[in-house]
């Protein structure tokens, strides 16, 4: 059994027990979050596709940690001029473990 969910503007294929890194959610460690945006559910060999979401389907996940990704460097410059800008960015994420798929 698997489901396709949407969170943070991205889509993920999940099964029970999967570990997932998603865009930051407003939840603290060990909280259980419910994701209602279930786009499709496969159960016993049959695929149910929502339009746009499957009614009554939910995915429950436990928050394992909140963190930041690796740092990326953004460097802008203009040649032959004295213009240089260096900026770093670390994207915040939430690590989830999928506990249950209700369909």
UniProtKB/Swiss-Prot annotation:
PROSITE patterns: RIBOSOMAL_L21
Keywords attached to this entry: Ribonucleoprotein, Ribosomal protein, RNA-binding, rRNA-binding
Function summary: This protein binds to 23S rRNA in the presence of protein L20.
Protein's name in the database: Large ribosomal subunit protein bL21
Pfam families linked: Ribosomal_L21p (PF00829)
GO annotation (BP), single: translation
Record-annotated membrane-spanning stretches: none
Summary of subunit composition and partner proteins: Part of the 50S ribosomal subunit. Contacts protein L20.
Species in which this protein is naturally found: Alkaliphilus metalliredigens (strain QYMF)
Gene Ontology cellular-component annotations: cytoplasm; ribonucleoprotein complex; ribosome
Domain of life: Bacteria
GO molecular function, a single term: structural constituent of ribosome
Higher taxonomy: Bacteria, Bacillati, Bacillota, Clostridia, Peptostreptococcales
Family named by the database record: Belongs to the bacterial ribosomal protein bL21 family.
């Amino acid at each position: 059994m698997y489901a396709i969910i949407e969170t943070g503007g991205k889509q993920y294929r999940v099964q029970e027990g999967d570990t997932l890194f998603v865009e930051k959610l407003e939840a603290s460690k060990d909280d259980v979050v419910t994701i209602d945006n279930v786009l499709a559910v496969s159960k016993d060999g049959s695929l149910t596709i929502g339009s746009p979401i499957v009614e009554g389907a939910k995915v429950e996940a436990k928050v394992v940690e909140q963190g930041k990704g690796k740092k990326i460097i953004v460097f802008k410059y203009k040649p032959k001029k004295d213009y240089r800008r260096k900026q770093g960015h670390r994207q915040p994420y939430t690590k989830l473990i999928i506990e249950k798929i209700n369909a």
